[in-house]
Amino acid sequence: MATPANQTGRITQVIGAVVDVQFEGHLPAILNAVETKNGNNRLVLEVAQHLGESTVRTIAMDTTEGLVRGQEVTDTGNPIMVPVGVGTLGRIMNVIGEPVDEQGPVANEGLRPIHAEAPTYTDQSTEAEILVTGIKVVDLLAPYAKGGKIGLFGGAGVGKTVLIQELINNVAKAHGGYSVFAGVGERTREGNDLYHEFIESGVNKKGGGEGSKCALVYGQMNEPPGARARVALSGLTVAEHFRDQGQDVLFFVDNIFRFTQAGSEVSALLGRIPSAVGYQPTLATDMGALQERITTTHKGSITSVQAIYVPADDLTDPAPATSFAHLDATTVLNRAISEKGIYPAVDPLDSTSRMLSPLIVGDEHYQTARMVQQVLQKYKSLQDIIAILGMDELSEEDKIAVARARKIERFLSQPFFVAEIFTGSPGKFVELADTIKGFRAICEGKYDHLPEAAFYMVGTIEEAVEKGKKLAAEAA
């Protein structure tokens, strides 16, 4: 039975983000949104615990400075509701669906609750199809599934957000689909930059409306933990609406680790006993509740790309380790590769995808990917010998393998459209067939005569040949 709405209660205690509210003869359901006024602002509190017959403990979705005991609170009778529909495209909303871009109210096709059941087994679709991103290293070695979940793993400052921006740019242009971007606990400056870059690159129009392709839902670093723990669900709700209308939606989360981190803060505030490394005891449940809703149905698909910060570059930390279980593909960014100046700094041996199977991608693609990985693996295993004894001690066969591996490493780099501003190199979208052809030719030794530098920061193999000719002419 639905809770009768507009029941009022009074605040009895405020401790940071935790607010206790006492109702008279009425108890709001867990996860209900209750509202109060804080100055001129609407403050939404989400019910987290029942403390007695008529008292609830809530988590605030905004700062609680200025709240006083005895203040009136109203039960809305529903979970947090956010606006959905094409009116959200090009706009920035917060966790409770209010616009924060100063462009007026959000035009919507109704409101949806942020807590919902995952689609049933019978509603889910299981077809395997590849999403071509135009990024060589991704398409060749760890291809993304349409309607799959992709994890972008990397420490601080190795290029996760830039890779996400490039994916949004490439897929919006090549695919024409809608995207939803959930900014969870990341830098406000990055969120602001992203908003303006979308307008400059034509992904969105200022103020939203016709021609906009991406809805933004932000709960940044400075927000209380309640907002950061729920903003991913608000973004997902917007994406689910598009999917249910038959769209193929891209859902970006930057950063899923902050979702876990906020959950851990909320858990501590509610007095739960922490588990391993101080994380919440409900870590797997929280992650599962979010991830199971990101799926493809017979109506449409949600392909999700999730940036996953890896604390201290330790992949065995419970937060990234719990995320691994849900993913179809992983793109691991490696600091050692970014230090060589190779961007995107994707680790070709650590990144995986369940789509890399001859039954899905075909024999030629599969064999080329495996050849590339074998050459790189051989180079990796020889690195200790090279470091101690030098290249001269290697056999002729090994010398050739190392030379090819170094060319492959450089050919895995690529100029990005979204990085044009600070690299000066125009971005490249490389078709899958060109990617396969180029890497196969390098592995087979057709370009052994070209210098390594020719393969650095180019798109197709033809561009590498051109660059090689230029370098030869300059050296002459």
From Swiss-Prot:
Q: Which organism is it from?
A: Rhodopseudomonas palustris (strain BisB18)
* Major enzyme class: translocase
Which SMART domains does the entry link to? AAA
UniProt xrefs under PROSITE patterns: ATPASE_ALPHA_BETA
Q: Which domain of life is it from?
A: Bacteria
Q: What quaternary arrangement does the UniProt entry report?
A: F-type ATPases have 2 components, CF(1) - the catalytic core - and CF(0) - the membrane proton channel. CF(1) has five subunits: alpha(3), beta(3), gamma(1), delta(1), epsilon(1). CF(0) has four main subunits: a(1), b(1), b'(1) and c(9-12).
This protein's name: ATP synthase subunit beta
EC number of the protein = 7.1.2.2
Which residues are noted in the entry as ATP-binding? 154-161
Molecular-function annotations in GO:
ATP binding; ATP hydrolysis activity; proton-transporting ATP synthase activity, rotational mechanism
Q: Which GO terms describe its cellular component?
A: plasma membrane; proton-transporting ATP synthase complex
Spell out the family assignment given in the record's similarity comment: Belongs to the ATPase alpha/beta chains family.
Give the way it sits in the membrane.
Peripheral membrane protein
Q: Where in the cell is it found?
A: Cell inner membrane
Query: Which keywords are on file for this protein?
Result: ATP synthesis, ATP-binding, Cell inner membrane, Cell membrane, CF(1), Hydrogen ion transport, Ion transport, Membrane, Nucleotide-binding, Translocase, Transport
What SUPFAM superfamilies does this protein's entry cite? C-terminal domain of alpha and beta subunits of F1 ATP synthase, N-terminal domain of alpha and beta subunits of F1 ATP synthase, P-loop containing nucleoside triphosphate hydrolases
PANTHER family from the UniProt entry:
ATP SYNTHASE (PTHR15184), ATP SYNTHASE SUBUNIT BETA, MITOCHONDRIAL (PTHR15184:SF71)
Q: What is the purpose of this protein?
A: Produces ATP from ADP in the presence of a proton gradient across the membrane. The catalytic sites are hosted primarily by the beta subunits.
Q: Does this UniProt record's set of keywords contain Cell membrane? A: yes
Q: Please list the reactions this protein catalyses.
A: ATP + H2O + 4 H(+)(in) = ADP + phosphate + 5 H(+)(out)
